[in-house]
UniProtKB/Swiss-Prot annotation:
Placement of sequence motif 'KMSKS' region: 575-579
Binding site for ATP: 578
Source species, domain of life: Bacteria
Protein name per its UniProtKB record: Leucine--tRNA ligase
Keywords: Aminoacyl-tRNA synthetase, ATP-binding, Cytoplasm, Ligase, Nucleotide-binding, Protein biosynthesis
CDD domains (alphabetical): Anticodon_Ia_Leu_BEm, LeuRS_core
Family statement: Belongs to the class-I aminoacyl-tRNA synthetase family.
InterPro entries: aa-tRNA-synth_I_CS (IPR001412), aa-tRNA-synth_Ia (IPR002300), Leu-tRNA-ligase (IPR002302), Leu_tRNA-synth_edit (IPR025709), M/V/L/I-tRNA-synth_anticd-bd (IPR013155), Methionyl/Leucyl_tRNA_Synth (IPR015413), Rossmann-like_a/b/a_fold (IPR014729), tRNAsynth_Ia_anticodon-bd (IPR009080)
Compartments, record wording: Cytoplasm
């Protein structure tokens, strides 16, 4: 008997796929389409187990849908721009382009060795001119619409990577790539007006029925829509006003001070003549701007000489520069009510600012102790003049009416989300296609001159971008007036590229951004990736899709119908990482056990949404199962050569039992496939093989039927072995283009059933009965059974409880 030689099987199968262009996909209106997509990887150079799991999930889905008769698009590409490649190139003294292309070639070969069914004819790399040309074109369209703009902005500055970070890219006060403490810095930045789409992005979350609730909740919170009042505080002895937004106007009469951001114009003006304030502002620049960090870091402030007038009471109120107020939120000022806001209370305690209680509890029994903490619940107004006695709802309306009539405030809908800063001060990215002219200002490059090519022959350093030092790149003529001008040297945030790549896969060679194929394939039917992308990539991609829709490029409102967020791969309870020394190299596993084993383990060890704990014994178990599958085929290959068909009238009792088990497991597997519960699909395969092995006298036709069902269920998981056996057993040419098995409902109709017999709730017998018996007939047979009679003779049968074809309980006394 032949041994399971996974190496030869996998090589020959991959060669078959290559020769036959098996995975190439074209538009076919006669079939239902299915677009399956896993998030494109950064080409780091080597695959890790997280990659293997993520892309195996996508491949299993794509193969299953293809076997369901659908026209499946399953593409792959590379998120190739960005700092990691630039930093690696500096370290290894190579150009980022050369480094990236070398990594892509190697990773592609690793993907192929795992048997992934990617249509490589649609491959894209975001660093290729043919790709980024069209995002430059799109940016120009957005600029013309006023959806892209440039302004000075206080940004998160990474002093190591020498670039700006979006708020989402700052983790615990540090740069997500470098780990450096982030600083605040004001520089000119390009932005996209995502705030113009905030309402629609929020509303359309309701359309995402097949997204995880956790992701939807994160996006809802990140967009952060809230209704409140903007209140105007007049600066004393000045014509200026400070506007603040509040969702709690019922606490307005309790304002004890205003807090302004360190970058607020009034703070900067006073700092010119106050060295202590200037030093405090410098200190604030070195602290985190992330909300999570602001909530936990020490509250610090500096009392200014500025005073404002309360809009209702006309009291004079102090203004403090506070490290917890962000210039990027609202007007960079907040009203502070220490008695009713915990953060304000902590600040007031530190600086001995008095408290004024203006809300009391609806519950008279509740004791409010402002010495211990703020009272933050809604209640009844007190110490609020004409508004005393009002509840929150009535106070909101009354104070809104007063402020509006006095021109001292107005109702506002506010969003937590802010416009997306898309420019980065690094080299390895897509050049922003803008030109700066002294006479004309910022002017877009002429569309016929696109793409603005990124120079590849550059001297890289760790300090910022070299583009500003390349005369032939930076010195250009103004597209409008023709005078000497300067090209923009900032490049796009890499999230710009990854926000539309899924659409370009539909028409990767089109001489336009998207063509009609986009509307055939979009939206993506199944999208697979990590939950860590919930509020960056997934939100930006939704935004981009709506921008493309409004440009007439796509017709759908949302890019991804169904989202699957896979769990991490752990070893010893921790995420695999070089620093922890717990990395498992997939290539070593492929060499030792074969790609099919690695794929099978990654799908069987845990449900896809949960973390997978690495286990060498689990891998060995997967390999052992595949050897059993191979050995069964070897032992029975003579049977398959006979071309046997199933004849139901010739089936034995044993055949019928086996077919019941096989088709029951097939039915469960189809249900679990559709729910993406792949671990239980693999379990069904194991049960079918056990069934085939456990019955000694199965008809040859049942063996053929059962094993062909097993191979087709297993094929999406272990495509090499199943392809090989399908051909070797003369079942067909290519299992991938074979229809998925259909449940035979006749096989699920049992001639007999096993009945559990209880007496007074205790198990006494198990009887095999004819499935055609009525309830009364079942009762008669059970009561007449000699073994059962031994328990009930000379006893009174009080009642008989029958659960059809499962259980009967005889109550006696």
């Amino acid at each position: 008997m032949n041994e399971y030689n996974f190496s030869d099987i996998e090589k020959s199968t991959q060669e078959y796929w290559r020769k036959n262009d098996t995975f190439k996909t074209i538009e076919d209106n006669t079939k239902e389409k299915f677009y399956c997509l896993s998030m494109l990887p950064y080409p780091s150079g080597t695959l890790h187990m997280g990659h293997v799991r993520n892309y195996t999930i996508g491949d299993v889905i794509a193969r299953y849908q293809k076997m369901q008769g659908k026209n499946v698009l399953h593409p792959m590409g590379w998120d190739a721009f960005g700092l990691p490649a630039e930093n690696a190139a500096i370290k290894h003294k190579k150009s980022p382009y050369e480094w990236t292309k070398s990594n892509i070639a190697y990773m592609r070969s690793q993907f192929d060795s795992l048997g992934f069914s990617f249509d490589w004819s649609r491959e894209i790399a975001t660093c290729d001119e043919d790709y980024y040309k069209w995002e430059q074109w799109f940016f120009i369209q957005l600029y013309k619409k006023g959806l892209a703009y440039r302004k000075n902005s206080v940004v998160n500055w990474d002093p190591v990577d020498q670039t700006v970070l979006a708020n989402e890219q700052v983790v615990d006060g540090r740069g997500w790539r470098s780990g450096a403490l982030v600083e605040k810095k004001e520089i000119p930045q390009w932005f996209l007006k995502i705030t113009d789409y905030a309402d629609e992005l929020l509303q359309d979350i309701n359309k995402l029925d097949n997204w995880p609730e956790a992701v939807k909740t994160m996006q809802i919170n990140w967009i952060g829509k809230s209704k409140g009042l903007t209140v105007k505080f007049k600066v004393k002895d000045s014509n200026q006003e400070i506007e603040v937004f509040t969702t709690r106007p019922d606490t307005l009469m309790g304002v004890n001070y205003l807090g302004i951001a360190p970058e607020h114009p009034l703070a900067l003006k006073e700092a010119k003549s106050n060295s202590q304030l200037a030093a405090f502002i410098e200190e604030c620049k070195k602290t985190s701007t992330m909300e999570a960090d602001l909530a936990t870091q020490e509250k610090k402030g500096f009392k200014t000489s500025i005073k404002v007038i309360h809009p209702i009471s006309a009291e004079t109120i102090d203004v403090w520069v506070a490290n917890f107020v962000l210039m990027g939120y609202g007007s960079g000022a907040v009203m502070s009510v220490p008695a009713h806001d915990q953060r304000d209370w902590e600040f007031a305690q530190k600086y001995n600012i008095p408290l004024k209680q203006v809300i009391e509890s609806n519950d008279n029994k509740l004791k409010i102790d402002l010495e211990k903490q703020a009272f933050t619940e809604k209640g009844i107004l007190i110490n609020s003049g004409e508004f005393d006695g009002l509840n929150f709802k009535n106070a909101y309306q009354a104070i809104k009416k007063y402020l509006t009539e006095q021109n001292k405030g107005y109702e506002t809908t506010n969003f937590r989300i802010h416009d997306w800063g898309i420019s980065r001060q690094r080299y390895w990215g897509c050049p922003i296609p803008m030109i700066h002219c002294d006479d004309c200002g910022a002017v877009p490059e002429k569309e016929e001159n696109l793409p603005v090519r990124l120079p590849t022959d550059v001297a890289l350093t760790e300090a910022g971008s070299p583009l500003k030092d390349i005369p032939e790149f930076i010195n250009v003529a103004c597209p409008e007036c023709g005078k000497p001008a300067k090209r923009e040297t900032d490049t796009f945030d890499t999230f710009f590229e990854s926000s539309w790549y899924y659409a370009r896969y539909t028409c990767p060679t089109a001489n336009q951004m998207l063509d009609q194929e986009a509307n055939y394939w979009l939206p993506v039917d199944k999208y697979i990736g990590g939950i860590e992308h919930a509020i960056m990539h997934l939100l930006y991609a939704r935004f981009f899709h709506k921008l493309m829709r409004d440009q007439g490029l796509v017709k759908s409102d949302e890019p991804f119908k169904n989202l699957l967020t896979q769990g991490m791969v752990l070893k010893d309870g921790a995420k695999m990482s070089k620093s922890k020394g717990n990395i498992v190299d997939p290539q070593e596993l492929i060499d030792k056990y074969g790609a099919d084993t690695v794929r099978l383990f990654s799908m069987f060890a845990a449900p896809p949404e949960q973390s997978l704990e690495w286990s060498e014994t689990g891998v060995e178990g997967a390999n052992k199962f595949l050897r059993k599958v191979f050995n069964y085929a070897e032992l029975n290959k003579v049977i398959f050569a006979k071309n046997i068909t199933l004849e139901s009238q010739k089936l034995t009792k044993e055949d019928k039992k086996a077919r019941f088990e096989i088709h029951s497991n097939l039915k469960q597997a189809i249900f679990d496939f559709d729910k993406s519960q792949f671990n239980t699909v693999v379990s069904a395969c194991m049960k079918i093989l056990n069934t085939l092995n456990n019955y000694d006298n199965l008809s040859e036709s049942v063996k053929v039927e059962g094993f062909s069902i097993l191979l087709r269920i297993l094929a999406p998981f272990t495509p090499h072995l199943c392809h090989y056996l399908w051909q070797q057993l003369n079942l067909g040419e290519d299992i991938l283009h074979t229809s998925f098995p259909i449940v035979d409902n006749n096989a699920l109709e049992k001639d007999e059933f096993l009945l559990v017999v209880q007496i007074n709730g205790k198990l006494k017998a198990k009887l095999e009965l004819d499935a055609s018996l009525s309830s009364n007939q079942v009762e008669e047979v059970v009561l007449a059974d000699e073994h059962v009679k031994s328990f009930i003779d000379n006893k009174q049968v009080v009642k008989v409880i029958y659960v059809p074809q499962k259980l009967i309980n005889i109550v006696i006394k």
